[in-house]
Amino acid sequence: MSTGSAGAGSGDGPPGLVETAARGDARLVADLLDGGADVDERDDSGRTAVTAAVYAGSAPTVRLLVDAGASVDLQDDSHANAFLALGETGNVSVLDEVLRGDPDVGLTNRFGGTALIPAAHRGHVEMVRALLARTEVDVDHVNDPGWTALLEAVILGDGGPAHTEIVRMLLEAGADRDIADRDGVTPLEHASRSGYDDIAALLTSR
């Protein structure tokens, strides 16, 4: 696979920077950078090495790339970048390294959502906690389907302990429980319809 950029690699040649970062091989990443590889090189999908390293969960590789000047904001063809990938993976072990790159937390994924929304959807309790405590991510951002993180946690969650805790944290962070979806259905109404009694109780308490 080749993007035509230096160090991109090909099926017949050595792996490029992005592929190497996706393997979490910090030592070889360092060698490639020392050899002149572009730290913001992209693969055929537009993905950068630092984004690949976040998906790989390799904190040393992310640290190395950020220290070398990699942009954590560059988005690939699916609109993913290093910061947005955190919401998908929930891997808090790489959060510190991504934050060192001063990410734009307002950038959105292919669904128009911030990193907080998929983290809430997927039940990534510790990632939601960290994003709320350590970034200025908008707790009430509405994505393209018309859902906030609170709505997403209720609608796409399973009503279990993880999603209940996420709802609690979002409310404590000031999430607006009255923001409804495009059909005018509130988080409380969704929780009640789904039989998520613990979540409904949180949403009725003030």
Q: Predicted segments — roles?
A:
Residues 28, 60-61, 93-94, 126-127, ...:
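Conserved ankyrin/ankyrin-like repeat signature
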Residues 90-146:
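Eukaryotic tandem repeat interaction scaffolds
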Residues 19-24, 52-58, 85-91, 118-124, ...:
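Ankyrin repeat A-helix N-terminal signature
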Residues 1-16, 162, 172-173, 182-185, ...:
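Ankyrin-repeat-protein effector appendages
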Residues 30-38, 63-71, 96-104, 129-138, ...:
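Ankyrin repeat domain, specifically the short helix-to-loop turn at the C-terminus of the second helix
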